[in-house]
Design a protein with these regions (language model features):
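Alpha/beta-hydrolase active-site loop
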Residues: 208-229
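Short beta-strand/loop motif that positions the catalytic acidic residue
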Residues: 316, 322-324
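Short beta-strand element of the alpha/beta-hydrolase
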Residues: 153-162
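Conserved alpha/beta-hydrolase "acid-adjacent" motif
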Residues: 329-335
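Short solvent-exposed beta->alpha transition segments
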Residues: 26-29, 41-88
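Conserved alpha/beta-hydrolase
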Residues: 180-202
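Catalytic active-site module of serine/aspartate enzymes centered on a nucleophile-bearing elbow/loop
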Residues: 360, 365-397
């Protein structure tokens, strides 16, 4: 669920010897190659004592599913950016994987040992002049407004990402579901606003809870959408995908009620429960749960303890459209049926599932696997039709 995975970053307090940058580069390159080919036994031999204690071989090997989710490295080993930090050399390899772009950061101490290893998203680009920006206090997130052709005012849908450091298109592998939604809905007379997620734009800035990670910026985006020329401020809708759908009831409770809420692959169960189910589905070691739990502070999990999105949704005074891919292994039909059961008393809730669709709402056959996301695809017209019909339906009907 949380795609940014910090393996370890430790600085040895004792500098035994000084290594020139060229020697350090050779060590870092070797460690990079071993990491990519998952030769964890060889890689672990390069660790400093502190690193070995923090990341023993059995934990290091548990990173294998993370590397599989990134996909294959599209090119050979990239030339790293080199920085000197506290007497150590830090090598930043910006890697184009088949599923995403990530930095692999390797720190070499003066003794020639690996003192740090990190997978993190590269810094996002700064907003372009004249570009829309979602502003929350000091946070500034580049945004894109997609308007239909013709005369407005148009209804508008604000798109809220799933977990992880997402760009404005919610790019996963070869696919960009939010771009599909923006273009497809514009062709159907519906405007959209999409933006770079905070954890993508500010990858080094910690977030204590989902309020900082998701909710505050979604509320700012909804407010920005209401201010746009050509948009009907009374018809501003919220669309959440995956974690964005999970948190949609909290977002809706944080400000003026949206005209309606669309949930795509909205989970109901706790994040760690879903993660366990995903690991079991993929045959991955359950030790990865420890990595996931450690990727966020205790305050993050405490904030979500006891959160019941269905119970909160019952209190939201807005119609819901809840859509689910039946081939989705990340958020399954179990969650969809929990929505159905929990909101069955509401007359303004529409639920629909699609037999061929996966978590990204792309068509496929048989068992869905992460490799499927590397195949280019697009959200089908029938999903776009269903969303547009919901948004354009007159209020009270």
């Amino acid at each position: 669920m949380i795609r940014k995975v910090v393996l370890c970053l430790l600085a040895s307090p004792i500098f035994i010897a000084s290594l020139c940058a060229a020697d350090s580069r050779a060590i870092a390159d070797g460690a990079f190659d071993e990491f990519i080919r998952q030769d964890f036994a060889s890689l672990a031999k390069r660790f400093s004592p502190e690193m070995s204690a923090a990341l023993p071989l059995e934990k290091l090997a548990g990173v294998s599913p993370v590397l599989k989710q990134l996909g294959a490295l599209r090119t050979g080993r990239p030339t790293p950016q080199i920085m000197a930090v506290q007497g150590m050399n830090v090598f930043i390899y910006t890697c184009d994987f088949s599923m995403t772009r990530m930095n692999i950061v390797i720190t070499v101490n003066p003794a020639g040992q690996i003192a740090g290893l990190q997978i993190a998203p590269p810094p996002a680009e700064a907003p372009k002049p004249g570009e829309l920006v979602v502003v929350t206090d000091s946070i500034k997130l580049p945004a894109t407004l997609a308007l239909p052709t013709g005369t407005g005012p148009f209804p508008i849908v604000v798109l809220v990402h799933g977990s992880g450091p997402n760009d404005r298109d919610e790019t996963v592998g070869a696919n960009a579901p939010f771009k599909d939604l923006a273009e497809g809905l514009a062709a159907r007379g519906v405007a959209t606003l999409r933006y770079v997620k905070r954890t993508k734009q500010y990858p080094q800035s910690p977030v204590a809870t989902v309020k900082e990670e998701v909710i505050d910026d979604a509320l700012s985006a909804l407010a920005l959408a209401r201010q746009q020329p050509g948009v009907d401020p009374q018809r501003v809708f919220l669309l959440g995908h995956s974690m964005g759908a999970y948190l949609a009831p909290r977002i809706a409770q944080g400000g003026p009620a949206p005209a309606g809420i669309v949930l795509l692959a909205g989970s109901v169960r706790p994040i760690l429960d879903l993660a366990r189910e995903q690991l079991q589905y993929l045959g991955a070691p359950l030790s990865m749960l420890d990595t996931l739990r450690a990727s966020a502070p205790a305050s993050y999990w405490d904030d979500l303890a006891g959160y019941d999105p269905v119970a909160l949704a019952r209190k939201v005074q807005a119609p819901f459209l809840i859509l689910q891919g039946e081939r989705d292994y990340q958020v399954t039909m179990t969650d969809f049926n929990l929505w159905r059961e929990g909101l069955k008393a509401r007359q303004d809730v529409t639920l629909k599932s699609y037999p061929k669709l996966n978590h990204l709402f792309l068509e496929g056959e048989g068992k869905s696997l992460p490799a499927e996301y590397s195949t280019p695809g697009h959200i089908p017209a029938y999903v776009l039709d269903d969303i547009a019909a919901f948004v354009k339906k007159p209020a009270g009907r």
